[in-house]
């Protein structure tokens, strides 16, 4: 998948335009957000449940290396194979090699974010193995070659007419229709054939349980269950932070994930695999290969602050509540993970230099933090990344590749910080700036300004600087008060 | 050579993780239990039925196995089913579905009738109008079915056909997921797969429009026995 | 009489001094004695939010030097209060002596409505305003400080005022400091939605407790809906009080 995080501002502008043209787009996250509220209300103490989710994820990260070893040991004891990949390339190449060795003509995929992160589809195609996305939304955007608009509803923004044309051309649909149910039915028939004949299935996973060596997937469509039932070979890919200590923890995270994601008490299907099929079982994989992907995470893990971003369980509650995501949609974020989740993860995965706009395009409103079932403090992380741009000399900045700020900004804050601890300088600075600032003001309002602050004035006014600041007034009339 | 490369990636990753600064493990906050934990047997069955129906499932209640078979016959006739795929699990075994099929002239198949995976897949994907299974558990908390997949419970029976009919003895209804998982993972070997099924296969991926039967069953019918 | 030290945010000092004046009169009316340290400048938020921690630290130390001995510090801004309460201890975490001073100061810093209602136990300031009022839950007031009931109690106690509900009242207005200027496409769309919700609420007036939101929403209203008003809670209460007299 192409990375376009550096075009954030431009893409965000396009996103705003699209949402303006189609107000229904903004309703998607709002609808999911409302469902989430109702879903959480079914728990006796939602706040305690969320806090417990945060504690579980925090513990899982604290014990990460031990839990991974425990998981690996138990998964192998269950009969699974475990492959460790340092990078996206290592993971993709391994899966391609395995698919070739097994003689797979195509690969059926269950919906997963990690395989997008490692660019598996591209790698498979290059080697002449067709990847077929089993999830309806992923299937649509795969054929359209566009990024996911929303992590759990990747094609929710695509017009039915576009889908109709796509299915007529590419998915053997017989009669043109724009009815979502008939379109869904056409996709069912087409993908059913792929599920039926599949010899090689690839899925991601939501949780890996250290205690039992079990992997767990949540879904509503059944594409993942098919990918884990029909083929002879099942490859399940996980990033290394997916591991949880116990089955009990996994059940709690499952409750939270379903509710925070779609407001469901539990998603339609939850499948838990402990090894490949056993003798006498007629379906299920003959071999189960679990690929544990690092792709930069062990490096992120070195930094105790940045590490907190790895708590994420990909529920998308933060997207749905984010006022910025609601305006711009998923494309602007430029890679796999959109919304606040992406704003805290992608800078670490791709480097701060390629993602500076992402973590600066945030008002720090804290809505994401307030809904996160994993206890991620997104605003603090974004402030941290911003500081790494500025203090290029600290080791973390080197690790994540901070990108220098404009010299004018740096100079401004240098001057600012000199004045901020000297009030006389601060106040004389104000007196000096006032005539400049108020040059174009009219009746106490500034309506236009060129240069560095022009962005504000496109659609907004600003009050002129007061003839007397509060400070100056206080000096004069404090005796009256 | 190959082995060494694999091992080194593993060790490299783990060593890096182990070398990182340690952080404390937080204390877990107290959580009040779900209200289902306090329910009695009858209440559990009602709660299960209520929740399962809320997930657009359909519930029939039967007093005993004979009654369950009658109900099943009714469903099969109403749906106009010619052939069904059935599991051989311990819930279904006493119902003797093959004999029942002959009596009502419906072709009853089970995985044992097939030479292997491919033949079985052909039938379960394209040759049957419904899959019939027992369940190992049913969970009142969310109206959820729990199925342990093994040689008597093939995965595709509850997944590939457009209709899934599950026979649920009331004594298999438990309050919460924890009650299920504790027994499924009580001792090794663990089942190759364990699934929770809650309602039909569905999607909202096209403009948020709910579409049931995306890949799996469009409807799930439960016959609650006992 | 309870002495309380006022922190005047730089946005208020420079552009919205009437909010500071309103705060003075409100505090006095509520039976407190507001004092003002001449040496105050800025809490340091702009620097911290742009990543300039070293520079923000200077502001923090200056603030602590100035306000460190005060029994109570009150400011008409949730974000400035949040800066002092939450970010100062974090910023100064690597300097034990300063950290201790920051941590000791933190619980004594209040947002204005919080101070009036929770500390002075005053919710009726004796004001009158005939009309419908909507309240914007500013991010740093609501989620930053958990302050929401206090301003609503103060508004509801104003004679003749009806507090009406507003859709998405807890959604960010799109200010975010430099964000508003640097990402105008997004920020404008956000403030448009906020104003749309305000207009749809049928309120005559929008009240809030954060100068940043006031500049943003007010700036947009001034350009597009000059007949509609947005006010800081302090100004509203003080002005409504004057109308009464």
Positions of PLM-derived features:
Chain B
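The feature marks the mature, well-folded catalytic cores of soluble enzymes
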Residues: 2-226
């Amino acid at each position: 998948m192409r990375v376009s995080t550096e075009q954030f501002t431009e893409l965000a502008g396009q996103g705003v335009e699209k949402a303006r043209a189609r107000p229904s787009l903004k309703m998607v996250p709002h609808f999911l957000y409302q469902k989430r509220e109702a879903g959480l209300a079914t728990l006796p103490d939602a706040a305690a449940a969320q806090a417990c989710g945060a504690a579980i994820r925090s513990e899982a990260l604290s014990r990460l290396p031990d839990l991974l070893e425990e998981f690996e040991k138990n998964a192998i004891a269950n009969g699974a194979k475990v492959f460790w990949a340092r990078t996206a390339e290592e993971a993709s190449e391994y899966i391609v090699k395995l698919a070739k060795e097994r003689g797979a003509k195509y690969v059926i995929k269950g919906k997963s974010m990690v395989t997008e992160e490692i660019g598996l589809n591209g790698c498979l195609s290059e080697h002449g193995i067709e990847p077929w996305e089993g999830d309806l939304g992923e299937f649509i955007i795969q054929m359209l070659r566009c990024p996911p608009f929303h992590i759990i509803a990747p094609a929710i923004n695509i017009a039915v007419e576009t889908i109709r044309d796509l299915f007529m051309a590419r998915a053997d649909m017989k009669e043109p229709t724009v009815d979502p149910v008939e379109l869904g039915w056409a996709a069912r028939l087409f993908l059913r054939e792929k599920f039926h004949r599949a010899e090689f299935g690839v899925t991601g996973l939501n949780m890996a349980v250290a205690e039992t060596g079990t992997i767990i997937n949540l879904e509503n469509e059944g594409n993942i269950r098919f990918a884990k039932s029909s083929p002879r070979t099942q490859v399940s890919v996980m990033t290394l932070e997916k591991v949880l200590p116990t089955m009990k923890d996994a059940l709690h995270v499952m409750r939270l994930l379903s509710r925070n994601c779609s407001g469901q008490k539990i998603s339609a299907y939850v499948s838990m695999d402990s090894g490949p099929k056993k003798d006498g079982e007629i379906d299920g994989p003959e071999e189960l290969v679990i690929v544990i992907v690092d792709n930069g995470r062990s490096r992120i893990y070195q930094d105790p602050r940045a590490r907190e971003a790895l708590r994420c369980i990909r529920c998308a509650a933060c997207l749905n509540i984010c006022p910025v995501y609601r305006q711009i949609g998923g494309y602007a974020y430029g890679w796999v993970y959109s919304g606040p989740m992406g704003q805290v993860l992608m800078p670490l995965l791709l480097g701060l230099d390629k993602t500076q706009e992402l973590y600066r395009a945030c008002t720090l409103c804290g809505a994401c933090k307030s809904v996160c079932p994993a206890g991620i403090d997104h605003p603090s992380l974004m402030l941290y990344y911003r500081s790494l741009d500025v203090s290029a000399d600290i080791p973390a900045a080197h690790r994540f590749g901070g990108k220098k700020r404009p010299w004018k900004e740096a100079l401004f804050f240098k001057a600012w910080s000199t004045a901020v601890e000297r009030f006389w300088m601060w106040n004389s600075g104000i007196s000096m700036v006032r005539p400049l600032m108020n040059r174009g003001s009219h009746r106490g309002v500034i309506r236009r300004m060129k240069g560095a602050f022009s962005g504000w004035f496109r659609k907004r006014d600003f009050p002129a600087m007061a003839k007397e600041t509060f400070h100056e007034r206080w000096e004069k009339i404090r005796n009256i008060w | 050579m190959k082995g060494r490369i694999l091992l080194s990636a593993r060790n490299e990753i783990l060593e890096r993780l182990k070398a990182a600064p340690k952080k404390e493990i937080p204390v877990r906050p107290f959580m009040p239990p779900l209200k289902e934990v306090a329910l009695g047997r009858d209440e559990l069955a009602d709660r299960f039925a209520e929740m399962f129906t809320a997930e657009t499932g359909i519930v029939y209640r039967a007093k005993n196995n004979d009654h369950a078979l009658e109900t099943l016959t009714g469903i099969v006739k109403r749906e106009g089913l010619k052939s069904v795929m059935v599991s051989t699990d311990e819930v279904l075994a006493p119902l003797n579905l093959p004999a029942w099929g002959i009596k009502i002239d419906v072709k009853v198949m089970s995985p044992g009738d097939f030479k292997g995976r491919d033949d079985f897949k052909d039938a379960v994907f394209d040759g049957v109008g419904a899959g019939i299974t027992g369940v190992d558990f049913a969970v009142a908390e969310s109206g959820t079915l729990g199925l342990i997949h093994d040689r008597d419970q093939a995965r595709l029976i509850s997944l590939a056909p457009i209709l899934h009919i599950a026979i649920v003895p009331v004594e298999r209804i438990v309050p919460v997921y924890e009650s299920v998982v504790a027994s499924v993972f009580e001792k090794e070997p663990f089942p190759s797969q364990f699934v929770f099924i809650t309602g039909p296969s569905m999607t909202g991926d096209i403009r948020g429009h709910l579409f049931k039967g995306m890949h799996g069953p469009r409807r799930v019918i439960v016959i609650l026995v006992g | 009489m309870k002495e309380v030290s006022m922190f005047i945010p730089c946005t208020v000092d420079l552009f919205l001094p009437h909010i500071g004046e309103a705060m003075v009169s409100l505090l006095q009316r509520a039976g407190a004695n507001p004092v003002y340290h001449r040496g105050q400048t800025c809490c340091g938020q702009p620097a911290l939010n742009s990543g300039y921690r070293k520079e923000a630290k200077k502001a923090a130390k200056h603030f602590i030097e100035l306000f460190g001995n005060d029994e109570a510090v009150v400011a008409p801004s949730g974000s400035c209060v949040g800066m002092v309460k939450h970010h100062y201890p974090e910023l100064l975490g690597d300097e034990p002596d300063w950290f201790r001073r920051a941590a000791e100061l933190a619980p004594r810093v209040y947002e204005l409505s919080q101070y009036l209602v929770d500390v002075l136990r005053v919710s009726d300031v004796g004001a009158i305003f005939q009309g419908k009022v909507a309240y914007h839950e500013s991010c740093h007031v609501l989620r930053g400080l958990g302050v929401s009931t206090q301003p609503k109690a103060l508004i509801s106690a104003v004679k003749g005022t009806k507090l009406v509900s507003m859709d998405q009242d807890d959604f960010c207005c799109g200010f975010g400091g430099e964000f508003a200027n640097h990402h105008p496409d997004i920020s404008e769309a956000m403030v448009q939605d906020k104003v749309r919700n305000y207009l749809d609420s049928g309120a005559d007036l929008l009240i809030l407790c954060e100068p940043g939101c006031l500049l943003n929403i007010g700036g947009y209203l001034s350009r597009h809906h000059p007949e509609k008003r947005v006010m800081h809670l302090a100004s509203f209460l003080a002005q409504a009080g004057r109308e009464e007299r």
